[in-house]
């Protein structure tokens, strides 16, 4: 190097030091209890954050077994996203061990995903005979696309608190996520005509379909302009299904697919042979065509009930990452809708 420098000086060639690069800003470290929250967070943070999830996508979120590696993960986190109800009862012990004030409840990086969501199944009374009842309401909030919008807003709020210098960047990406949800749910054409927030407000109030049926555009009902997931779900709208566990209520409300029977008699209580037989008889009597279950429950039992009733089993992941190729919230909802449509149609549903 010395010889080269001497030669350059002799030739009167200016010697310059290599350019000094500005230090890359530290990326925001986001940890989520569930992979679906992680997928939403990833859409918002872009390349300015690193997102990790504790539970796997095919794991029952009620019964996650904490690993020692989770403690340093939370200890270094800037943001922690959890449902905030009584779904992940394993979270408080992890937070205690991590001892990170930033992400404990009340800290700037703690995000309760349920905030601002109208909870279903809030009990008016409680006793142990009801099983593992959720005392605050049904915590499976992510099964509704409009709830996913509110979850994204909650994550954005936490990100702004811990990384105000990136607030505008995160806000724009969160808005992009909302816009994509509206287009995926209602269809691009209807969103252009009425705007996503307007349609979302009507939907939350339970007035969307009456509005679309009675209001016209260019001489035809606005319902003709409906697209997206809601249009794909029209063939099975109003048709009852049987479910394994009471985790589809928000999905059922959005798409009007009521769960009328449950293999699991009460939350957290394994079904007895007698109860399973009752469900089989009820499904036969009511001509239930579809049995919906997530893929962490007893697959053999689900398939047995489906076989004995003539129903089609739809076995799908509850969260992103729970099956191959299901990486985003949009992948997850696409799968749920397409598998139910297939089950109610002529083809057989695929178990994932």
Question: What are the functions of these language-model segments?
Answer:
Residues 3-15:
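Bacterial N-terminal signal peptides
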Residues 18-352:
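Extracytoplasmic metal-acquisition and chelation regions
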